[in-house]
């Protein structure tokens, strides 16, 4: 017989909460909690906008992938073309006589926002920047970045060069997860290739100047795009990724980014809804040496919830009972369905906490008697 038992999760020690809403001045924004895969804010997040130098993250990703599959190494030297040398905007001040390593170029793209470095990488990997941009677009689509189209490697203003804030956030997540051996470069404060750019040697990311756990990733600015930032910060067991675009000044970018990081960490906290191994319900056992067995969650269920205010959460236990012996510890016997207003329902397998051996003849007769007695009692109570 299918058993359904409703629980108040407050009895297990937690509650649902209401967060204080945050209104950002950014034209578009995306804020994400990595551990719980929770989007905390999305404002025009899927709309493609000019990304400016934030799109260099895709060029950097392509370089990291090329190193991962052995096409190049950090020590590989690359040729600087006239086109690369003539790039305007932020540069490493490369010239045709240079043979910068891939390591130099990656630092130049991340820290100096070097447009020349992007062209060198593009030509080194694909022959031309145009061919490389086409590869970037194709690769982005394969990675699930549905709203990204690239016309060049640097983010230089070009018709049709677009990325959404969500895509930039997903790209940041990939760089963090897939390339930990290189990710520390994003927190590097300065880089000056051959002592040529003392005024352009500092990382522009304003979050790196603050004591908030920031460790990346990239700023961007053009007249059309406004001021933007892809950032990430770690506090305790949590990592936040944020993407902002379309702000009016460097000061606004820095202020909004700091506010969003603080909001994400202070207004939300990790809560364990149910802990693995904690008895949730005692299920009747049929023909066992014991008359019941505890059902426990197979794993912890942790959710990121707003950290102020409170209201109840409910759960439903579902299992087929009585459960016939023998029963092995860890056997899946039911499920726990957790329901929180505003969140998707979570289903957790319930497993037997202990073994229950099959009983002998007398034990079986005792079990039959006890179960009949229990059902008779419940029937009389219902009347």
Can you describe what each PLM-predicted range is?
Residues 4-15:
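Bacterial N-terminal signal peptides
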Residues 10-12, 20-22, 42, 233, ...:
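Sterically constrained small-residue positions within well-ordered secondary structures
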Residues 16-20, 314:
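Residue-level detector of intrinsically disordered, flexible termini
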Residues 19-180, 191:
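Active-site-adjacent loops and short helices of periplasmic peptidoglycan-processing enzymes
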Residues 145-149, 157-383:
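Domain-terminus/edge residues, biased toward the C-terminal soluble/receptor-binding domains
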């Amino acid at each position: 017989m299918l058993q359904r038992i409703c629980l108040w999760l407050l009895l297990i020690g937690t509650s649902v909460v209401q967060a204080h809403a945050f209104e950002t001045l950014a034209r578009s924004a995306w804020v994400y909690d990595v551990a719980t895969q929770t989007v905390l804010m999305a404002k025009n997040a899927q709309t493609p906008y000019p990304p400016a130098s934030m799109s260099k993250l895709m060029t950097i990703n392509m370089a990291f992938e090329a190193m991962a599959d052995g096409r190049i190494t950090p020590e590989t030297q690359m040729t600087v073309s006239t086109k690369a040398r003539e790039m305007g905007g932020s540069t490493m001040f490369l010239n045709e006589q240079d043979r910068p390593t891939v390591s130099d170029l990656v630092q130049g793209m991340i820290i100096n926002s070097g447009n020349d470095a992007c062209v060198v990488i593009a030509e080194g990997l694909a022959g031309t920047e145009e061919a490389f941009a086409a590869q970037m677009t194709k690769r982005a689509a394969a990675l699930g970045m549905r709203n990204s189209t690239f016309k060049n490697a640097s983010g230089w203003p070009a018709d049709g060069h677009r990325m959404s804030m969500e895509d930039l956030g997903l790209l940041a997540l990939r760089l963090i997860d897939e390339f930990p051996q290189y990710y520390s470069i994003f927190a590097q404060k300065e880089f000056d290739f051959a002592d040529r750019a003392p005024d352009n040697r500092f990382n522009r990311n304003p979050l790196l100047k603050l004591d908030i756990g920031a460790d990346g990733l990239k700023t961007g600015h053009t007249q059309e795009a406004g001021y933007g930032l892809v950032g990430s910060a770690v506090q305790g067991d949590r990592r936040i990724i944020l993407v902002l675009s379309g702000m009016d000044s460097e000061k606004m970018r820095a202020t909004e980014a700091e506010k969003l990081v603080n909001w994400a960490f202070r207004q939300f906290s990790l809560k364990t809804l149910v802990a693995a191994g904690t008895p949730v319900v005692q299920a009747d056992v049929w023909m066992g040496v014991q008359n019941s067995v505890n059902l426990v969650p197979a794993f912890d269920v942790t959710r990121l919830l707003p950290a102020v205010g409170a209201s109840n959460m409910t759960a439903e236990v579902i299992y087929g009972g009585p459960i016939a012996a023998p029963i092995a510890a860890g056997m899946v016997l039911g499920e726990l369905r957790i329901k929180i207003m505003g969140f998707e329902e979570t289903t957790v397998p319930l497993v037997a906490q202990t073994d229950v051996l099959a009983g002998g003849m007398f034990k079986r007769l005792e079990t039959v008697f006890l179960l009949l007695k229990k059902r008779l009692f419940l029937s009389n109570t219902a009347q």
